[in-house]
Amino acid sequence: MAGASALLLTATTPAAANPNAINPIPVLNGTAGLPHLLGRTRAVFQVTGMASPNSTQNYNVLGTDLGIMWDNGNGEMLTAFGDTAGVGFPNLLAGSLWSWRSNILVRSHNQDPDNGIFFDSVVHDIFGQARDLVASPKIPLIEISRIPTAGISVNGVQYMSLMSVKTWDDVGQWTTNYSGLAASGDDGESWADLGFTHRPNEGGNANFQMNAFTKSGGWVYEYGTRSGRNNPAYISRVREEDIANLGEYEYWDGGKWKKGDVDAAAPIAENVGELSVMWNDYLGQYVMLTTDPFNSVVMRKASSPEGPWSDPEVLIDTRELPTAYAPSIFPYQTGRDLYFLTTVHNQYNVVLMRTSL
């Protein structure tokens, strides 16, 4: 197995971390049409970009990544995308020829993704362009980007967890300043950066720089990893009404929950990238999607939010789609079919995937 793993690593090129060295123009970037996958997963819809039925170029989104989806509490789906490229004044300081935004939001009422995900509206500026939700100076070594990693609705308020990126490092690696919450009371139109929720990239808080949310029994469960990919995953929880109060968070130490002690958190899974977690009615289990060290998209299952989590199952083999990252689960139940978004870095856009459970 060790020899096979080494061969696999040398045969593929994983997704880069730096989003500035990209080309989102179809054909010119070497891509045309949806990825052709032969395994258990199929690419079913181009969600963003010039080749998408959503025509996101109409609001100056030529390329983007992530696609973190959640229900706003009223049957509307909100989707936050990360670093976003368009035409306009280039962000040369960050090494990009594109006009850059770090976090944008679209809305949809699509609860059946079988024919795709279609957007109803976008948070935009006076020119109709998708705009940053939370401002970022985009200055290397200070804050080069502020990227959403999780979203959730609690008591009519929308919350996003964002990471403040200091530097882009080696392939699949970056360094953050901190993570923290932003909140919106108007369906994602305007956002307040909640500075008192910032987790500095040090000590136990370093394990919660990138997040995923799920809710159960009045609790919000927050999954966390260090900045970058191929790190252990951790979990905390907090009562819904206390989501913005870091002192009320409890951390799973491998056997019990410990309140207020972030250093007590023990790993619940190893070698993960960006995370997405959701209860699945068909399986009667929680499902976790992420990428593995070979850059395959993988799934784990568990009967409770803290686990124990199963060994990973490959949903998209890296040999079929080596630049895929950040799988994000569609937030509504869809029976035996599991739908999720995945970024394809070499086209720098987001694709809807479907796999049979």
Residue ranges and their predicted role:
Residues 1-17:
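Secretory targeting and sorting signals
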Residues 201-215:
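Flexible gly/pro/ser-rich segments immediately N-terminal to CXXCH heme-c attachment motifs
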Residues 315-338:
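C-terminal structured domain segments
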